[in-house]
Design a protein with these regions (language model features):
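Subset of outer-membrane beta-barrel
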Residues: 1-253
Length: 253
């Protein structure tokens, strides 16, 4: 759905162990210019035991990452939209740090009378500005080419979506190139309540232990609208390893 007003959102993800992720974002529209946005993302990986070459514990160290994002979006006509993000990324591990710059580019085409939406994006175009060690080789950013489509059904309060990720990565054959996909469904149960279900094929493969995957890759969540506020919760299963909890709140200022 297209953004209206001045949307502001905060989200928090409780990952495995002591890993936590928080995101704060805001955007506003300038007449005849376009929509500008800003966001901050922070990941804390918790604390780790530090040891010498003989395995003797000498203390603790932490690891964290931050991303500062500035975005712009506009429309070419009533159906075709484009946007871009510029990101400054900081990563710190113990007393070492690294920085990077990256750009995201995206296109969105909507057919409102048919309830179709199509998207294309190239994520993380860029590279390191500084390295953890001056003598080490520069690390590549996780470049990702994404194609997606969604459809709101006419006779059911249901929106279906399909996204393909990492289309830029080399695979053994043509079919393998499309193995990183996600499927989603959003049921509008009432004006204030939505139910969401999803499946991540790549995540299911990654968290398969032996021949057992459990419910890894399956997601469930709900959205509740109270007055001018939207509250969202989601759970993503990582199979036998555990799961992720996502909490979000958004409004328009």
């Amino acid at each position: 759905e297209l953004l209206q007003g001045n949307p502001t959102s905060f989200s928090f993800v409780k990952h495995l162990m002591d890993i936590n992720l928080a995101t704060l974002s805001y955007s506003t529209e300038f007449e005849n210019i376009g929509r500008f946005g800003a966001a901050v993302k922070y990941i804390n990986y918790g604390s780790f035991d530090e040891a010498d070459d003989f395995g003797n514990r000498t203390g603790e160290f932490g690891a964290n990452e931050m991303a500062f994002i500035i975005g712009y979006a506009n429309n070419l006509d009533e159906n075709f939209y484009y946007g871009a993000n510029a990101k400054f990324i900081y990563s710190g591990i113990a007393d070492r740090s690294s920085t990077a710059m990256a750009v995201d580019l995206g296109l969105h085409y909507a057919i409102p009378d048919k309830n179709w939406n199509f998207g294309f994006a190239v994520l993380n175009l860029g590279g390191q500005l500084s390295k953890y060690y001056e003598t080490s080789e520069a690390e590549d950013l996780p470049l990702d080419v994404v194609v997606g489509v969604s459809k709101r059904l006419e006779n059911l309060p249901l929106r279906l979506s399909l996204d393909f990720h990492k289309l830029n990565e080399d695979r053994d054959d043509f079919i393998e190139r499309f193995k990183a996909f996600t499927v989603g469904a959003e049921f509008t149960l009432s004006k204030v309540l939505k139910l969401r279900l999803g499946y991540d094929n790549e995540r299911r493969s990654e968290f398969k232990i032996g021949s057992t995957a459990g419910v890894a890759g399956f997601n469930a969540g709900l959205g509740v609208k109270v007055s001018d506020y939207q509250f969202d919760y989601g759970y993503s299963s990582l199979g036998l390893v555990g799961g992720l909890h996502r909490i979000g709140i958004s409004t328009s200022l």
